[in-house]
Regions:
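C-terminal soluble interaction/assembly domains
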Residues: 62-65, 74-174
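A small/polar active-site loop signature that marks catalytic segments
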Residues: 1-110
Length: 174
């Protein structure tokens, strides 16, 4: 049936690295949610039928499997959705550092690092850490909600060592 169909239109997606960069640099969390849904769509296509499981749940299960493979226990990272804005999304600083350390060892590590906001240069960190050793050195994702402020990413030490870090402030009032 589809062999005889006419294509009425086509929309091509930007490359994954551009989607990731748009999501991370400016904290466009809907882009990041859509990446989780894309993973979930692929996972559901590969899964045996098991009743109704949403695309989001398939994506969360895939992410949970990756975290377990890295050695992050379920109690250290609870994923409720892909934006990080839900109160059901919980992660310890240690879990984030373990994930960042794992990602730093992957072939796409440099692409990911460049997709993160850079202190004093661009994205959500453009106005932060200027005229400090962190400027143009810290590559990190920001995250904030009422009374919650987080920063997780990479920094290069004065000795040239690349470090993963996560800073989380809860019940923080400016």
């Amino acid at each position: 049936l589809l062999r005889h169909a006419d294509v009425l239109g086509e929309v091509l997606s930007p490359p994954l690295w551009q989607i990731l960069q748009r999501g991370l640099k400016r904290s466009q969390n809907l882009y990041l949610q859509n990446l989780l849904l894309s993973v979930g769509a692929q996972a559901s296509a590969d899964a045996a039928p098991a009743g109704f499981i949403s695309t989001q749940d398939h994506g969360i299960k895939a992410l949970d499997r990756l975290l377990a493979q890295i050695g992050i226990p379920p109690s250290a990272a609870l994923i409720g959705e892909g934006t990080g804005l839900s109160r059901r999304d919980l992660a310890t600083p240690d879990a984030l550092v373990r994930l960042l350390t794992y990602l730093a060892a992957q072939p796409y590590a440099q692409t990911l690092r460049q997709a993160l906001p850079i202190a004093g240069v661009d994205g959500t960190l453009i106005g932060h850490m200027r005229r400090t050793a962190a400027e143009n050195n810290v590559h990190a994702k920001t995250g904030s909600m009422t009374y919650v402020h987080c920063l997780a990413g990479y920094v290069t030490s004065a000795a040239g060592e690349r470090l993963a870090f996560a800073i989380m402030l809860n019940n923080y009032q400016r």
